[in-house]
Amino acid sequence: MRYLTAGESHGPRLTAIIEGIPAGLPLTAEDINEDLRRRQGGYGRGGRMKIESDQVVFTSGVRHGKTTGAPITMDVINKDHQKWLDIMSAEDIEDRLKSKRKITHPRPGHADLVGGIKYRFDDLRNSLERSSARETTMRVAVGAVAKRLLAELDMEIANHVVVFGGKEIDVPENLTVAEIKQRAAQSEVSIVNQEREQEIKDYIDQIKRDGDTIGGVVETVVGGVPVGLGSYVQWDRKLDARLAQAVVSINAFKGVEFGLGFEAGYRKGSQVMDEILWSKEDGYTRRTNNLGGFEGGMTNGQPIVVRGVMKPIPTLYKPLMSVDIETHEPYKATVERSDPTALPAAGMVMEAVVATVLAQEILEKFSSDNLEELKEAVAKHRDYTKNY
């Protein structure tokens, strides 16, 4: 399974093409749109979310509510594009029109300046348009397809925010994936501790009044994962490594950890390793899950627990200093629409990319042309694992 996305932030549409989804997977536009709505939600979101109400359109690969095995093409129309027809025109236009909304003041922390240098742009909007987090719309759409596949294999996935701008959220112990999903969905800030809800919302309001932004940490948890996804035989086949790449590829994500993560560096080995248990009912399990569901780059049957750290959104309403690329004079950075935080939305993107990598790994291990064969192969593997 592989995919590509295309489109600009203020272009006419966003597109994704997925190849490798088995035939026979039940799939509707609403399956995708539900996740797109969640990506646009969350406390503190700003103007763009009021303009766009994302709806996906299938143009190939789905017929009568089921996948056909052909490449799946999905489009999302950018409604805001009508205000940008000249600025984002694919055809050559007059110089006076080209200068409208031209960007020469790069924003610190964005791709603006480095993209301009790399691709030799005199208008940094070319960098901004593709590097914008608007692109993650289609990664969420791709992830929604992947999640439908995982659900057919009795795997479940959820995300929630565990740190908001330095404020750690207390997470009750032993929550199931379903409980995490339910609690986070009921929260405007995607946390599982309702007692902290108003405190976090007040904090976001204060950050907005200050013209500043905050980052934080998002956790994704996956249950029902088969044993043995990934491999130790080559460095690039380790599944946790593939997931790490996917997570830090998300806009503004700067770090990733599994299970205890960096805390493991402060503990003794006897306090980190997960003891192995066996029972006739459950087969092999672990007493703890400090390693986040991985051993040797492979899934061990425990829930996958992965966290990603998101830096504060770099577009500030009190902009930092920058330099004009034409005059080299100091200027305040360009201000585009921005939010004080996008952590709840980022959680949806992280959930999507994790689901996508897991779907790719499932289809690599249990290669199947249709859903029925895939389900049979996974069920057979689970029986084998339990009786090993």
UniProtKB/Swiss-Prot annotation:
Entry keywords, A to Z: Amino-acid biosynthesis, Aromatic amino acid biosynthesis, FAD, Flavoprotein, FMN, Lyase, NADP
Pfam families (alphabetical): Chorismate_synt (PF01264)
CDD domains the record matches: Chorismate_synthase
InterPro entries named among the record's database cross-references: Chorismate_synth, Chorismate_synth_AroC_sf, Chorismate_synthase_CS
Cofactors, names only: FMNH2
The keyword Ubl conjugation is assigned to this record: no
Entry-linked PROSITE patterns: CHORISMATE_SYNTHASE_1, CHORISMATE_SYNTHASE_2, CHORISMATE_SYNTHASE_3
Signal peptide range: none
UniProt EC number: 4.2.3.5
GO BP annotations, alphabetical order: amino acid biosynthetic process; aromatic amino acid family biosynthetic process; chorismate biosynthetic process
Biological source species: Streptococcus pneumoniae (strain Hungary19A-6)
Enzyme class label: lyase
List of residues binding NADP(+): R39, R45
The keyword Transit peptide is annotated on this UniProt entry: no
Name of the protein in its database record: Chorismate synthase
